[in-house]
């Protein structure tokens, strides 16, 4: 009963923070879907060779077939799609087909909870010449995979790389993630710096409310001044 009462007394922001930390992987597919749409529209004018267009069409066909699989057959469909996508990625290193194929392979590996393989594919996607469109989200997902592998230091490194990319559109989320991991490591000063940076630069952001709650908690616990 005491445990239940303690849980009920937790601030709403702390509960939301815990929920997002626990289920952050559920949001990745949405982010990637939006990014891929942006890629298609952003680079369509630059896809001038028939080989690139053919590769994109092949990839779209593979992904479409995979998306039509029902729950009973989706595992088999992933097993069929993955080598095809990996082959496209290997044959098209450095161009838009390779970029999208690496991201698609990463999504499949991620759905299979193969965190190391997924991370490798996310990182491969950052090496193409078109990576500016997607580097931030790829580094973010590499960080999440690293968290799943309990490799916190690598996760911190990839979150920092995501923040440093020129086209990062979700820095507030990344700052909170960094603060969360640093706090978990016991580096409360560094965690507070990220929370404060979030508070100062994104005062109206939803992540700022969570950061403020952590700053209050850290001060109340005497972990920061």
Report residues per predicted region.
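N-terminal positive-inside, membrane-proximal cytosolic segments immediately preceding the first
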Residues: 1-35
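Short solvent-exposed coil/turn linkers within tandem alpha-helical repeat scaffolds
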Residues: 89-98, 112, 128-135, 162-171, ...
